[in-house]
């Protein structure tokens, strides 16, 4: 049997025991991938960071351990990184 964790509506996107952890990093837009990874892992050490070109089609399942980094052609963060 499998279970699905759905993203709740509203500002708090966390559904687990990590309610005090940061869930988005707007300050990282324009930074390098390495800078972004370093900051995110300081805030959320268990994060699985996935780097993708901006515009990539992704699955819709919500995972509290995943942060996607959408990068431009210069490998700079193009969208706000978020848990999910």
Curated annotation (Swiss-Prot):
Q: Which residues form the signal peptide?
A: 1-12
* GO CC annotation, single: extracellular region
- UniProt site positions, description: Reactive bond: 60-61
The annotated regions of Basic and acidic residues compositional bias extend over: 15-25
Supply the InterPro entries for this chain: Prot_inh_pot1, Prot_inh_pot1_sf
Write out the ranges of the annotated region (Disordered): 1-28
List the keywords (alphabetical). Answer: Protease inhibitor, Secreted, Serine protease inhibitor, Signal
Which GO biological process annotations does it have?
A: response to wounding
GO molecular function, one example?
A: serine-type endopeptidase inhibitor activity
Give the record's note on temperature dependence: Optimum temperature is 25 degrees Celsius when incubation is carried out at pH 7.0-9.0.
Main localisation, per the record? secreted
Compartments reported by the entry: Secreted
- Domain of life according to the entry: Eukaryota
Q: Which PANTHER family match?
A: PROTEIN, PUTATIVE, EXPRESSED-RELATED (PTHR33091), SUBTILISIN-CHYMOTRYPSIN INHIBITOR WSCI (PTHR33091:SF55)
What is the annotated quaternary arrangement, including any partners? Monomer.
**Family classification:** Belongs to the protease inhibitor I13 (potato type I serine protease inhibitor) family.
Per its database record, what is this protein's job? Inhibits B.lichenoformis subtilisin, B.subtilis subtilisin, bovine pancreatic alpha-chymotrypsin and porcine alpha-chymotrypsin with Ki of 3.92 nM, 5.70 nM, 7.24 nM and 9.35 nM respectively. B.lichenoformis subtilisin is inhibited with a molar ratio of 1:0.87. Also inhibits chymotrypsin-like activities from the digestive tracts of the insect larvae T.molitor, P.interpunctella and H.armigera. Does not inhibit bovine pancreatic trypsin, porcine pancreatic elastase, or human leukocyte elastase.
Protein name as catalogued: Subtilisin-chymotrypsin inhibitor WSCI
Report the source organism: Triticum aestivum (Wheat)
């Amino acid at each position: 049997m499998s279970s699905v964790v759905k993203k709740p509506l509203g500002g708090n996107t966390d559904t687990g025991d990590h309610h005090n952890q940061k869930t988005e990093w707007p300050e990282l837009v324009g930074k390098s991938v390495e800078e972004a990874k370093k900051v995110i892992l300081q805030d959320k050490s268990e994060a699985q960071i996935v780097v993708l070109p901006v515009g990539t089609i992704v699955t819709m399942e919500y995972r509290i351990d995943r942060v996607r980094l959408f990068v431009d052609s210069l490998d700079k963060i193009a969208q706000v990184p978020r848990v999910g």
